[in-house]
């Protein structure tokens, strides 16, 4: 294609949000295996290296993102331990930070050695903990970084050595005081000029609300409920802070009551409305979005970053125009316009129930009572009797979306079909198959009588539909990993992260 720009074209833009970041999280079933299979084949398994991050940073520049919280799960080598990672971040002018459980740019899961260093306990093991932080600060002198203050457990747990509310408050206050003194000394800078953020995530919010003094120059980053709904934003006093505020927002999640690590189906209107709300509360310094893989989260990630760059570019009441513009950008004017209707319907259907939640089950329950900590697959709340057969209507709506998507695909230029499969067909068809699998299995259980099930044609027909839908998910996933673009995306798609029921 020929690209051109008008003579004397000029544009002057500046971002609405200063730090626009991506957190590569829960990478175990997508980004990490893909990195090992493709971009970083020469590295050891678990080392997400400069090959992966170079490709990620190229995408981030296209999205106008400028900050990274690197992948940090157990089994993933720490970002700073892999040769070339820091250098490639510097070459793209990417600011490097770390998540709510990784203060001072430290990956505690893989870098803290309890056998050698003792407990990750600031109260009882302060000298060793401070040495651990100091080492990383010295390594990052001169680097463009955003330092996370505070302390939690090794990985997403409570701070050790404190039990009462008073101990938690005093302990965390001491941590912040120590960290700031360390940053000022080791970086040789006025501490008020060092970019810092404090993230009151889960139990830390209670400590903050009990009277924790977070210095005025530190940004406060508020969190959603892990499912896309912000639970706290800056009040009038906090809005006057020099350090400003920000948000940490999930487009994927691992944890109770249930993960969603397969597809990215958060409703675009919700993303838009929540980010507009954050902006209205002057939380404009730093926005970070949690994704298990940026390719899987392509549209919502683009929406999030477009708003971070220009908050006026998208309004909640007109978010469909943004979706249409994105579809046109990816697949051309005619196809993009035709896709708006089915994709809007798709997000409505997944808004009713995420595909990952169709088993009506929960995770991380008491293993004494639940095998693997998982509740069993249950009947859904979709009724085959009430509301004009709600169950069948839900399945029929999915079939209509599939028909409309299929019609667009038939007319698509061949060179666009791989991208179409990844961004449109796989999530639509796989979500539809999950709905069929769960709801037809439910129908079979309700129709069939236990003593005559194998002679009940209606029950057997529903059971076969359920089984075939499961096979369809397997087939689609195999195509994504092994045939799409000649195997370019091998290892990126896992239909059952954490081996949860699918």
Report each predicted region and the residues it spans.
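Feature activates predominantly on carbohydrate-active enzymes
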Residues: 1-123, 141, 197-200, 211-228, ...
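Gly/Pro-rich turn-and-neighbor structural signature
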Residues: 2-6, 11, 73, 80, ...
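Glycine- and acidic
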Residues: 33-43, 68-71, 115-119, 154-166, ...
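Hydrophobic alpha-helical scaffolding
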Residues: 46, 75, 119-126, 162-169, ...
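Generic, well-ordered alpha-helical scaffold segments in large soluble proteins
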Residues: 56-63, 85-88, 92-95, 99, ...
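Substrate-binding cleft of secreted/luminal carbohydrate-active enzymes
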Residues: 101, 267-348
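C-terminal non-catalytic alpha-helical accessory regions
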Residues: 323-501
């Amino acid at each position: 294609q020929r690209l051109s720009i008008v003579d004397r074209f000029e544009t002057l833009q500046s971002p609405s949000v200063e730090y626009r970041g991506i957190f590569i999280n829960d990478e175990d079933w997508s980004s990490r295996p893909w990195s090992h299979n493709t971009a970083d084949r020469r590295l050891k398994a678990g080392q997400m290296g400069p090959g992966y991050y170079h490709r990620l940073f190229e995408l981030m520049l296209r999205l106008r993102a400028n900050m990274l919280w690197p992948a940090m799960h157990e089994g993933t080598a720490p970002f700073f331990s892999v040769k070339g990672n820091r250098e490639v971040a510097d070459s793209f002018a990417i600011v490097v930070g770390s998540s709510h459980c990784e203060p001072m740019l430290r990956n505690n899961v893989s870098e803290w050695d309890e056998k050698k260093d003792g407990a990750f306990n600031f109260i009882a093991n302060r000298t060793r903990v401070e040495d651990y932080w100091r080492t990383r600060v010295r390594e990052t002198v001169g680097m463009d970084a955003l330092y996370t203050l505070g302390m939690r457990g090794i990985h997403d747990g409570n701070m050790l050595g404190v039990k009462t509310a008073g101990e938690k408050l005093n302990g965390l206050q001491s941590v912040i005081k120590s960290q700031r003194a360390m940053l000022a000394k080791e970086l040789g800078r006025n501490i008020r000029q060092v970019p810092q953020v404090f993230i009151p995530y889960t139990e830390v919010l209670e400590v903050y609300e009990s009277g924790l003094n977070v210095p005025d120059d530190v940004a406060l980053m508020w969190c959603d409920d892990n499912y896309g709904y912000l639970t706290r934003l800056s009040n009038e006093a906090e809005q006057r802070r020099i350090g400003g505020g920000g948000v940490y927002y999930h487009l994927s999640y691992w944890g109770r009551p249930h993960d969603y690590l397969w597809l990215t189906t958060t409703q675009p209107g919700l993303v838009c409305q929540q980010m507009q709300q954050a902006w209205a509360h002057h939380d404009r310094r730093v926005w970070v979005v949690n994704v298990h893989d940026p390719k899987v989260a392509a549209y919502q990630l683009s929406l999030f970053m477009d708003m971070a760059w220009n908050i006026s570019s998208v309004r909640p009441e007109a978010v469909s125009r943004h979706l249409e513009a994105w579809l046109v950008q990816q697949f051309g004017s005619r196809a993009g316009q035709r896709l708006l209707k089915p994709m809007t319907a798709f997000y409505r259907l997944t808004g009713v129930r995420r595909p990952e939640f169709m088993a009506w089950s929960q995770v991380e329950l008491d293993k004494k009572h639940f095998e693997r900590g998982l509740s069993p697959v249950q009947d859904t709340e979709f009724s085959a009797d009430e509301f004009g057969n709600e169950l069948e209507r839900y399945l029929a709506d999915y079939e209509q979306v599939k028909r409309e998507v299929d019609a667009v695909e038939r007319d698509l230029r061949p060179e666009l079909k791989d991208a179409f499969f990844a961004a449109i067909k796989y999530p639509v068809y796989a979500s539809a198959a999950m709905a069929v699998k769960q709801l037809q299995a439910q129908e079979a259980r309700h129709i069939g009588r236990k003593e005559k099930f194998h002679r009940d044609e209606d029950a057997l027909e529903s059971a076969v539909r359920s089984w075939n839908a499961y096979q369809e998910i397997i087939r689609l996933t195999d195509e994504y990993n092994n045939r799409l673009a000649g195997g370019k995306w091998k290892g990126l798609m896992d239909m059952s992260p954490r081996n949860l029921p699918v």
